[in-house]
């Protein structure tokens, strides 16, 4: 009954937090959520409604892989909510479910570790409403991966404790789900942390055989989870072969978003404003960096600091080490020893942003909140702790809050000072027996809830859902462009090239990004953009090269690149932006520049030139080259040009993962389709399979003879068939596991020695 009450309280907490999203027509916006999360989930939802798997999207970089890119989470199990007809409601439910799952399994994990009822609730609330989780929500996949750590821990530790096959299967499924959440660095950190935790708490009685069994069982769970996930991982691995990341990233790129030392101030204080558009409280301020706040609660900081007096407790000592190690690694380039770490740890160069290491510190803070609270209560009641260490910690934290607040005026310190005084006064009363333990612990829980609700979750920016539902003016003006010409939004004339305008996280900035239909916001409105964000396509080489070509070219060169990329419409961001009656910026249709001489989506050419890789791109964008007369290929073909050539493209039509082109011509020539060339595309000409040639560096061509032709292009990702077979094989193994001989149950001691032994002292 107590556990049901605890889980009900966590449900009510999550319900309270998400009430505006579920019942008041609010939606999350800002940063990645605005121009990545919502457009990608919307596209996925529309594909599900059509009953197809979205292998490909035409809405960025002249078409790019969608499913294999990993980030969209096509096979991520919670994505089933996107079968709901209301995409915004589905997204809000999607996040509500994740918050609820996070809090529930933090509670269950606390129970497994022997924490008291209130300590479990304090840890769970800290995890659900922490600044890390709020900040990670705006980066989507980072948040989705983080949620699964307590589930992976709980499942595997329950298996270790009870040796029930059901918990082992649960471990496999939890690891697989976290893997499919598409943040591999989080998955790796979770497994490394779990393995380290098991080693730390391994009893001497288990000996070497116990180490071997633990290593083998966790290793087997990982192998089975990766096997089940192969339907996603195999095509993603095939896509990686075309990525600039396949050989690893340089130290400079890898450490681009390191945790800045000044950001550590948000461990103590965090901005106090409400980020809600239309509330009048939106200040236009955004904390820079990968995570805009690290705040875990002022009481969490109290417990972390007090934890050093209990470091002989095995659990507290472990999580203190993890907390410090996570911050040390998160500093990245600001850590003088990090470059040695970068060169020493295998595969680390494949990932970006050392700030992500704060993930382990955040969960360490969550667990320390519960462990230290119980240790403090235990030692206080048994008088194994004097009042002076706690008072000293509180005085030092009060001084730290004042110092940070005075030096960082945008970080409000008033509430933190009040909470510290209330906690200190209550602890003194509890220490001298003036209030009962239940009163003190209940007050601690309430302080944590109020503190995190005031300071952290209110930083999750909300806006009315009409922000996403109302079409930009330019989207209506471009409604006939789909399948014919692409759109480009960004500077051309300026020497400082930028595809995103304005480079701001303010409310006006977000509204302008939507009005300008910048990548990938136009995905929602059926806009096919010639550009995009190369990082979301896993740094596909051709995408990076296209962006680099635009950056390096002069104004005339950029115009030529756009026209030869089938860009018929350029949205010019320069000039003043008028405001509507609500004070929101509106971009009028006169901002659209029409390129009447842009290449059509598909056309026929009579001639062919061969180009070397080193000259291919320069030749295509050269002013002297006429793309309507010749196609540039890198491989020789048997081709006899006709004395007379005439032809036209009769029709170009698109369906998901499919393009149909109908042509008629006299003489031999080539169809050029200005859609991205990518392995996985196949074509039939009049029902007979033919070869797709890589044309003009980026696009596709098919050699055709005289007559009328129907070309059917289909996309099926490389490695998907093999991945399906592997996933099916490992899934059958998992299903068969319960039929195998039961595991011999060997009772193990509790994984965490809590409460502390009587002889233990701070």
Where are these regions (language model features)?
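Hydrophobic alpha-helical membrane-insertion signals
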Residues: 2-65, 237-246, 302, 467, ...
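Selective detector of the "anchor" transmembrane alpha-helix that sits immediately C-terminal
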Residues: 8, 96-108, 112, 295-309, ...
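Membrane-embedded helix bundles of polyisoprenyl
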Residues: 10-13, 103-112, 117-203, 217-236, ...
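Membrane-interface coil-to-helix junctions
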Residues: 11-105, 125-147, 241-242, 247, ...
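Contiguous transmembrane helix-bundle modules in multi-pass membrane proteins
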Residues: 139-147, 159-172, 176, 186, ...
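Membrane-interface anchor segments at the N-terminal boundary of transmembrane helices
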Residues: 281-302, 408-414, 646, 652
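Active-site-proximal, structured, solvent-exposed surfaces of multi-pass membrane proteins
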Residues: 302, 328, 556, 568, ...
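Extracytoplasmic
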Residues: 414, 446, 450, 454-644, ...
